[in-house]
Design a protein with these regions (language model features):
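Positively charged n-region of N-terminal signal peptides that target proteins for export
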Residues: 1-4
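Sec-dependent N-terminal signal peptides
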Residues: 6-8
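N-terminal signal peptide c-region/cleavage motif recognized by signal peptidases
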Residues: 13-17
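Central antiparallel beta-sheet cores of small beta-barrel/beta-sandwich binding domains
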Residues: 20-92, 111-140
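Acidic, glycine-rich flexible loop segments
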Residues: 87-108
Length: 140
């Protein structure tokens, strides 16, 4: 009986130990003094959970992101879907701003930050020339 229970518990626990996937993307504004940040997103396929953080260059702390929603659109049959993903930036338990990213396949077409208090929008471009990894983040 004890062996059967242990086997059953092990079978239940194995799917729950699935790996969380991590993606690191680097962004910056245009201009002489660009604003740069690293976006880390996390996804757990078993729990169907998604979240993330942003860390601005020169900052030691990451700002948590709360997944708001994702829209998908098929632009052409047989091509990757276009996704528009929105996250809320959370500071002291309140929504401080909103990040919206439009992507298709591996291409990121736009990234916009909107300040919740002022409504000011800031457009960012993907920094493809910056090396990034899940272990070290963006190497500015």
């Amino acid at each position: 009986m004890k062996k059967s229970l242990a086997t059953l518990l092990l079978c239940i626990a194995l799917p729950a130990s699935a790996e969380v996937s991590t993606e690191v993307l680097c962004f910056r504004t245009d201009g002489d003094k660009p604003v740069r940040f690293e976006l880390r997103t996390y996804y757990d396929d078993v729990a169907k959970w998604s979240g993330g953080v942003v860390r601005y260059a020169q900052s030691k702390t990451a700002i948590p992101l709360l997944f708001k929603h994702e829209e998908q659109e098929e632009l052409a049959e047989g091509r990757p879907y276009q996704f528009t993903t929105t996250w809320w930036e959370m500071v002291d338990g309140k929504i401080n701003g909103e990040y919206e990213m439009m992507s298709q396949g591996a291409m990121v077409y736009s990234m916009t930050y909107t300040n919740a208090r002022t409504g000011k929008k800031t457009a960012f471009g993907r920094a493809l020339d910056v090396d990034a990894s899940a272990k070290s983040g963006c190497r500015w």
